[in-house]
Amino acid sequence: MKFLAILSLSSSALATISSIQLFAKSDDSKVDGLGLYSKHEGAAIDYLFLGKNGADLKYDDEKKQIFQELKTSSITVRQSFTLGGDVYELGATDNFIPVTINKDGTLSFTGDDKVYASKNVNDPYRYSESEYAVSNKKTDDSAPITIVAKFSDDKAAETSGVAQAASSSAGPAQASVSNFEGAAGQNKLSYGVGMAAVVAGLVM
């Protein structure tokens, strides 16, 4: 039982939350290289559009969850990457789309082979009449895209859940940084000293 508890704690402690931005890769020069950002379209619902810069987002590598934080006076809610109708969005939902970020930065998820930059998607505020929405639907003005993540090298990854509790209660943690090549270089925190102390405490 102690052995299983140690394995479970170790797995949770290695999970990280990284800062990322998303960009479109396409053979169509009109949309290639544009960043994904969100616009309010409803209650805790932000549709994803293409613009000059990508929005600052987070990636939970344990849950495979891309999200941004919506902060109110009393709570903080994760608005997660999901599909609302024909348009990809950031929504306050538990039914988010699990995403794997590959070493080359490309995103793998269910439906990733049919992603388009599309205008005129009939969004509530009609932003798509002048801007490209990220959609799974072709319209009269569409271009196929691949979504690529870029990790923010200047922002250290934040540890989640148990890792924070372990490092704070067991003393200073020893961090090491490893970077992938290209767009997928990401900052990972590896908790050595803190985890060793916690494991020792469990065994004793």
Curated annotation (Swiss-Prot):
Gene: RHD3
Free-text description of this protein's post-translational modifications in UniProt: The GPI-anchor is attached to the protein in the endoplasmic reticulum and serves to target the protein to the cell surface. There, the glucosamine-inositol phospholipid moiety is cleaved off and the GPI-modified mannoprotein is covalently attached via its lipidless GPI glycan remnant to the 1,6-beta-glucan of the outer cell wall layer.
UniProt keyword annotations, A-Z: Cell wall, Glycoprotein, GPI-anchor, Lipoprotein, Membrane, Secreted, Signal, Virulence
Lipidated residue numbers (GPI-anchor amidated glycine): G182
Organism expressing this protein natively: Candida albicans (strain SC5314 / ATCC MYA-2876) (Yeast)
Propeptide stretches in the record: 183-204
Signal peptide limits: 1-15
Keyword Secreted among record annotations: yes
Protein name in the entry: Cell wall protein RHD3
GO cellular component terms, A-Z: cell surface; extracellular region; fungal-type cell wall; hyphal cell wall; plasma membrane; side of membrane; yeast-form cell wall
